[in-house]
A protein has these predicted regions:
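Internal, hydrophobic cores of structured domains that mediate oligomerization or house catalytic pockets
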Residues: 1-64
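C-terminal interaction module
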Residues: 64-151
Length: 151
């Protein structure tokens, strides 16, 4: 398997109590099954990582999205972004879906912000990039997106 065809997982752990970041980079076309590549399937992976590592954020996007994100000094939304904050549609109306973490039945400690719930995020789709960019701008306007320096 070529490295360009595989997913990338970056987990940054330092002397703090929890990892400052988890980034999941997806190839442009994933070799996994449709279920594994679905919004629901990837959100389950993010939720599981959050329950184990309690990170400051988790970002899920193709590698090619990085130069297209709005802010160089903050995490990008890409396909999904987990933040350890309870967020509402009133705060982030541009989000196509907000998934509470943990799931129903337990106290919510964070939110997975989804830019594209019905397809795999693609930088070749201008609408996907535009939605992710609008979410990033909204989060910064509301002081909800931390800078890397603050993580």
């Amino acid at each position: 398997m070529d490295a360009a065809d595989s997913a990338r997982l970056k987990l940054a752990i330092d002397a703090k109590r929890r990892p400052s970041e988890i980034e999941i980079g997806l190839p442009a076309q994933s070799a996994g099954s449709a279920d594994e590549r679905s919004c629901e399937g990837v959100a389950k992976i993010v939720s599981a990582m959050v329950s184990v590592y309690d990170p400051m954020y988790v970002s899920v996007s193709p590698r090619e999205y990085f130069p297209r994100q709005v802010f160089d000094d903050k995490p990008g939304v890409g396909w999904m972004l987990y933040l350890p904050k309870v967020l509402t549609t009133q705060q982030v109306p541009e989000a196509r879906e907000l998934i509470p973490v943990p799931e129903a039945g337990r106290k919510q400690t964070g939110t997975i912000i989804v830019s594209v719930p019905d397809a795999v995020f693609s930088v070749d789709n201008a609408e996907h990039v535009e939605v992710a960019n609008r979410i990033e701008i909204r989060l910064v306007d509301q002081d909800l997106l931390p800078a890397f320096a603050d993580l």
